[in-house]
Every structure is written in C-alpha cells, then in structure tokens.
C-alpha cells in the first residue's frame, strides 16, 4: 500500500553503479570467501484486525524491527507480536495474538526483516566502493571474511576488487554441517564450486586470487586446487594469467621459531610446482583489524588469519598502473601484524620464498615481495612476473583486433613488426621494461602452417632495486 510523506528533503546514499570503468591494463584481485546469507528488507504492512495476523510479502528469516516508521523500533517480538510460519518461506506472518501494543485495524506499519540473499549473490561481482561491499555481502566479521578481504584490498589502493561469495546455504549439496556450522568438507565443496565461476572470467576481471581460507589438507586441498587453477588458466592456450596469494592459520600461542619453520616448509612445498612463480606466501599468520559492531556501535580489535594479509598484498600489487612497481618496502594500512620476527628468522623465511611483513618504526611494510620460485630474478620477483603477464595481456590488446582475420601479406608482416616495436617503445616510456634488443625482433610466417605468424624478440624487464652495496676506506692524513 502507498503511504504519504510530507514535503521535505530525504537524503539517501544510492548503491554504486554496476558498471565499473577502469583503465586498460588494470589488474583486479578476486576475493573468494564466506559472506552474509541474508539481507535486510523493509515493507509497509496494513493491519487487518486487532489481534489478527498479517502476512509478509516475501520470504523472511528473522525480524529486525517493527514500528510506525521505517527506522523505528516500537513493537517487540514475543511481547507484542509473534513471528510465525516456516523459516525462509513466503508464508511468514506477524501474529498480534500476544495482545500487547499493536497498530490500529487498517493502519499501516513498517516491518524490517532479513531474507535470504538472491541467487546472484554467489556470482562474480566487481566493486570500487567498500560501503557497497558491506551492503551486499555484510559487515566485516569473522564469518563475513569475503567483506574483510575485499575492504582491506581496496584500502591498499587497488582500482577495484572482484568478489565471489561462496554458497554454504545449499545444505543438500554438503556432506555435513550445513550453513550454520560448516565443516572442512562443506568449505571444500563451496570453494570448489567457486572455481567454476573463476574459469569463466577473463584476465581483466581476475588477476590475483585470494581464497579467504587457510585450509589445504590432503583431504580438502582447497589452496592446492586454486594453485592448479592458476597454473591452468596461465597456459598459453587459456590466455588468462593468474597468481595465487595465501597465508597461514593464526597460531598466536606458537613460538616464533615454530612459526618460522612452518612458513619455511610451506614455501618449500611449492618449490617444485610448475607454477611456483605464481604462488605467493605471506607472513605472519595473524593480523588484527579494528571493527565496529553495527548493533552496539562498540569498536574492538579482531584477530584474523593470514588470508587477510594475502588480500592486503593483492590489493597493493594491483594498486599501480605500472606492473613493474614492486611491493617491497611499501606501506600497508588498515590492519596490524600481531607477530614480530627477528631479522634472523625473517632471513630464513625469505630464503625459502616467504614474503614477510614487518614494522619499520610504526609503519607496517613488506620486507621483500617474492614468489616461491627462487630460480632467478625473473621468477622470484613478484613485479617481474607481473611484467611478464602484463606484456602478454597487452600484446593481445595491441595485435588481435587489428590483425586477426586480415589477409596474410608481406605488408601485414611489416605492419605487425612496426606495431610490436611501437608497443615495446611505449613500454620503455612507461618504465615497464628497461630495454629490448631491436635487432632480435623478427616477424615471420610459420614454415609448417601458413596461417600462423611467429613473433620473436628479446626484452629486458624493469628490475627492482633491492640492494645497495657501499664500500669505503678510512685514511689518515690530508690525502688518501
């Protein structure tokens, strides 16, 4: 039923537009994890009769408030009314039989309730506004980890963040536990289902994967499956280059030496994987963030596991237009690290391929951003791997629409070579690469298949400056 409202100004924040405009080459981290299962809805209800029953127009899980205005709490559940019917069904009712306070017969009142999220809640979504993330996926909490990770990533400066909220509500599909008390088996099924969505995303929608979990057992190898996914998608045939970042479970009671050895062993375990350069392990395993309770308004520090640190690293990597910019010695904000390692412990972990976050003064920084592949600078440095993938992605953008489907003439070969050289010159200007060997650039027709154009060239990426060695000698007297 419609209702009257007096003339006036009623401010309301609108949701962020669904279409997100990003620059060509923007890199997007995707956060995968648990979020809210219900959302708030407010309806205007007309009271049928005193002591009677009024049906809600939609399925509802619980009542938030009932009042004469949309933001008022006036009528109290069990004292003034009962909430009856089958949970999450369209036959939920406000039953005024307790004979407490109630609206007059024929009067309108407002019911705010929580209803199950729509089915598209579990699809891929991209956001640039953390308030919109909270509205859709729920407030930050230990159960809404997808919100925590996405907000942290945006706070580090990434242009946008992708979210896939795992679906734990389809209880018939899970071995045990269900949505209220999910087990490792339930999480494994839910995270595995999310891989089906990730396989449909292109590189401009998904660059870095951050599953908000540390579960990776032999029985439930969530993170191992995600690394295999990153490897498969990064094959030349798939053309969707990806990296996985993970943390470890929070172990606040463990000693530094125990945690050091665990991180070292974890990074070493990825060393032999074909996609080791696409695996980033971040330490420490516990971080804290101050979160305000939406109901009480009280702010408190909450401890999270290393997946939150992984989300922060992903957000910082994707924050720069230039993929050559490393996260080494960059500042991180919006959370704090709970564990402080000695330099000796950090050296041991870094020597095994762990990216460590530490305090320099009062500022949290990444000590050295590295992958688990220590073969050489081209595989160890996160920024160099990012350059590699950036060149691949931009090569498609530069060449595919312009040349694929053209007649394969000598003029086309010359034009392709000119485009490649111009593209690489731009990369030098943008400081993505340091140089390339122009004499090595060749564009030829494949000898075995006349439809294939082969391009080859030698490129020198822009390496990060990590060490400065200073040597000097003292001398006595006026001259050396």
Language-model region placement:
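Surface-exposed assembly/interface segments
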Residues: 1-480
């Amino acid at each position: 039923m419609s209702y009257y409202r007096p003339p006036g100004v009623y401010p309301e924040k609108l949701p962020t537009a669904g279409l997100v405009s990003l620059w060509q080459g923007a890199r997007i981290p995707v956060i995968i994890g648990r979020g809210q299962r219900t959302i708030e809805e407010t309806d205007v209800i007309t009271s049928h009769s005193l002591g009677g029953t009024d049906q809600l127009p939609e399925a509802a899980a619980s009542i938030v408030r009932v009042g004469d205005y949309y933001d008022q709490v006036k009528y109290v559940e069990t004292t003034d009314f009962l909430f009856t019917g089958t949970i999450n069904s369209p036959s939920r009712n406000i039953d005024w039989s307790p004979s407490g306070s109630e609206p007059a017969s024929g009067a309108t009142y407002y019911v705010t309730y929580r209803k199950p999220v729509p089915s598209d809640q579990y699809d891929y979504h991209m956001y640039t506004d953390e308030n919109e993330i909270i509205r859709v996926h729920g407030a930050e909490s230990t159960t809404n980890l997808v919100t925590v990770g996405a907000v942290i990533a945006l706070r580090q400066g990434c242009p946008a963040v992708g979210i896939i909220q795992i679906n734990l509500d389809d209880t018939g599909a899970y071995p045990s536990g269900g949505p209220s008390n999910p087990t490792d088996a339930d999480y494994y099924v839910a995270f595995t289902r999310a891989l089906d969505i990730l396989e449909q995303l292109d590189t401009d929608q998904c660059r870095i994967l951050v599953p908000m979990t540390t579960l990776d057992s032999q029985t439930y190898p969530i993170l191992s499956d995600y690394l295999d996914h990153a490897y498969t998608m990064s094959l030349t045939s798939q053309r969707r280059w990806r990296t996985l970042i993970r943390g470890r479970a929070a172990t606040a009671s463990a000693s530094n030496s125990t945690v050091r050895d665990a991180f070292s062993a974890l990074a070493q375990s990825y060393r032999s994987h074909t996609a080791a350069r696409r695996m980033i392990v971040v330490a420490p395993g516990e971080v804290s963030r101050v979160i305000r309770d939406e109901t009480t308004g009280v702010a408190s520090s909450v401890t999270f596991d290393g997946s939150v640190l992984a989300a922060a690293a992903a957000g910082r990597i994707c924050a720069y237009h230039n993929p050559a910019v490393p996260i080494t010695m960059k500042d991180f904000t919006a959370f704090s690290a709970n564990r402080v390692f000695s330099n000796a412990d950090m050296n041991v972990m870094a020597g095994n391929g762990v990216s460590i976050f530490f305090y320099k003064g009062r500022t949290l920084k990444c000590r050295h951003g590295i992958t688990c592949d220590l073969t050489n600078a081209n595989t160890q440095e996160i920024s160099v791997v990012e350059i590699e993938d950036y060149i691949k992605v931009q090569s498609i953008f530069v060449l595919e629409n312009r040349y694929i489907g053209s007649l394969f003439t000598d003029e086309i070969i010359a034009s392709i070579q000119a485009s490649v050289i111009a593209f690489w010159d731009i990369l030098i200007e943008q400081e993505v690469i340091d140089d390339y060997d122009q004499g090595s650039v060749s564009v030829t027709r494949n000898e075995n298949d006349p439809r294939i154009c082969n391009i080859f060239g030698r490129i020198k990426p822009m390496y990060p400056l990590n060490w400065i060695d200073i040597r000097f000698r003292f001398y006595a007297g006026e001259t050396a």
